[in-house]
Amino acid sequence: MDSPSQHGSHTSLVVIQPPAVEGRQRLDYDRDTQPATILSLDQIKAIRGSNEYTEGPSVARRPAPRTAPRPEKQERTHEIIPANVNSSYEHRPASHPGNARGSVLSRSTSTGSAASSGSSSSVSSEQGLLGRSPPTRPIPGHRSDRVIRTQPKQLLVEDLKASLKEDPTQHKFICEQCGKCKCGECTAPRALPSCLACDRQCLCSAESMVEYGTCMCLVKGIFYHCSNDDDGGSYSDNPCSCSQSHCCSRYLCMGALSLCLPCLLCYPPAKGCLKLCRGCYDWTHRPGCRCRNSNTVYCKLESCPSRAQGKLS
């Protein structure tokens, strides 16, 4: 039986194999010897379109910054070799390396153009996102450059006389003898001024000065803790009251404590001076009527006389 080689029939097969080391060296040699086809920029087209991001329909489109051209990367391609069964690897046609060179160049060129278009679209999208970033907030510790040159004006309580002149409808009940208002606000007794000290924790007033100066606050504390009934809080606030219960025992206890605390003996005269100061302050600062038995006259708007005029005519 004759073999196929004896009859002279040659069978061609297509073998797909990765390029070997010798094949790569020979391919590089063929590339150096043969002239490469150079494509112009007009012939190069992007495979896919690039996305252009905009902030809105009213905002003009920002030009994308130009990026430096990246070096083209050559892809590893599998070489299709038409092999002959009875021929060796060296007897392949000479035109095939040129075709492989052209295919590799076209693939690398298209890949580079697609990469450049993708990078430009990503840069434009980043610019759009940066343009829509929220404004920076000021630092909490940063102080403003504004300098306060004028101090705020202190709110002063207006005198009742001025309020009577501005709005006479508030004080309509006038005393017939002294000509002063007889409403509850004007006839209420005026207390001595007081304030809060030590970060608004301690009350600074004339009453507290008398109690702390004569050690009466210590006596009140003892009566408060020693009382067993519910009425202990009442006479602990007024230890010198004669109308409360346990009056004799309270005075005996205060007399015994005065031997150790002689400042308790100064409490009665200090209390009398406090009442005198209250009376003087109330006499000078109370704007209302002090008459006990007097008739009340009702005034209407313009017919109401001012308190500065004295008695009614």
UniProtKB/Swiss-Prot annotation:
**A Pfam family matched in the record:** Sprouty
Composition-biased stretches (Low complexity): 106-125
Cellular location(s): Cytoplasm; Membrane
Q: What is its main location?
A: cytoplasm
Question: How is this protein situated with respect to the membrane?
Answer: Peripheral membrane protein
In this chain, composition skew of type Basic and acidic residues spans 69-79
Keyword Acetylation on this protein? Answer: yes
How does the entry describe the domains? The Cys-rich domain is responsible for the localization of the protein to the membrane ruffles.
The similarity annotation says:
Belongs to the sprouty family.
Q: What is this protein called?
A: Protein sprouty homolog 1
Lineage runs:
Eukaryota, Metazoa, Chordata, Craniata, Vertebrata
